[in-house]
Structure formats: structure tokens, C-alpha cells
């Protein structure tokens, strides 16, 4: 069962975000993730709650638009992505981020 959850988790989950701004949010127990563009808030909430065994109080998200870039003679666009912010209860943490 855990293999199925972790396989599903890694298919839709891109990576956790660790920047200066997100480190400030970690003090308020808010975690930041980049996910698949088609994932909904409810799906993400259920996925995180089952994968890490935590209780989520709120989920916020936004879609970052793509940007144009040019390198020598090549022009293209960067991919757009969805960023999710989750807030946990005060007593709970996600083990991966707690060691940072």
C-alpha cells in the first residue's frame, strides 16, 4: 500500500521549495511545494495527509505563468507550474523539512 501511495506521490509531486522566503514561512508551519499543473487542492491535501500522516489546516495555490527566454539564436519559453502552500497544525511537522 505504501508503495502505491509513494509512486502516486512522485508522479504528481515535483519538489519542495527551499528559498529565503519559504524558510521564513517554515517558522509559521507553512510548507511550499511545486506540483503537477492539473492537481487540485483537494487531491494535494489528501496526498500529503496520507504520505506524511499529518493534518492540514489550509491549502493555497497559484499558477506561475511561463516566461520567454533567449539564448544565442534560440528562443523559447520556460514551463509554467503550480505552487502549493500548506499550513499544518502547530504541533505537527513534515520530517523532511524539520531537519533543515
UniProtKB/Swiss-Prot annotation:
Q: Per the record's keyword annotation, is Ribosomal protein included, yes or no?
A: yes
What organism is listed for this UniProt entry? Euglena gracilis
Q: Which GO terms describe its cellular component?
A: chloroplast; ribonucleoprotein complex; ribosome
- Locate the transmembrane regions by residue number: none
Q: Does the keyword Phosphoprotein apply?
A: no
* Disulphide connectivity of cysteines: none
SUPFAM superfamilies annotated for this entry?
Answer: Ribosomal proteins S24e, L23 and L15e (SSF54189)
Which InterPro entries does the protein's record reference?
A: Nucleotide-bd_a/b_plait_sf, Ribosomal_uL23-like, Ribosomal_uL23/eL15/eS24_sf, Ribosomal_uL23_CS
Keyword field: Chloroplast, Plastid, Ribonucleoprotein, Ribosomal protein, RNA-binding, rRNA-binding
Q: What is this protein called?
A: Large ribosomal subunit protein uL23c
Q: Name the domain of life this protein comes from.
A: Eukaryota
Q: What is the protein's known function?
A: Binds to 23S rRNA.
Single biological process term from Gene Ontology? translation
One matching Pfam family: Ribosomal_L23
* Entry's family note: Belongs to the universal ribosomal protein uL23 family.
* Subunit structure, as described in the record: Part of the 50S ribosomal subunit.
Please give the Gene Ontology molecular function terms for this protein.
rRNA binding; structural constituent of ribosome
> PROSITE patterns under this entry?
RIBOSOMAL_L23 (PS00050)
Q: Localized where?
A: Plastid, Chloroplast
Amino acid at each position: 500500500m505504501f508503495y502505491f501511495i509513494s509512486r502516486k506521490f512522485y508522479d504528481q509531486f515535483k519538489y519542495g521549495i527551499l528559498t529565503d522566503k519559504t524558510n521564513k514561512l517554515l517558522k509559521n508551519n507553512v510548507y511550499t511545494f511545486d506540483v503537477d499543473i492539473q492537481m487540485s487542492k483537494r487531491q494535494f491535501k489528501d496526498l500529503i495527509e496520507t504520505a506524511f500522516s499529518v493534518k492540514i489546516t489550509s491549502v493555497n495555490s497559484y499558477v506561475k505563468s511561463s516566461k520567454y527566454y533567449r539564448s544565442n539564436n534560440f528562443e523559447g519559453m520556460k514551463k509554467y507550474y503550480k505552487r502549493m502552500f500548506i499550513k499544518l497544525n502547530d504541533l505537527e511537522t513534515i520530517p523532511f523539512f524539520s531537519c533543515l
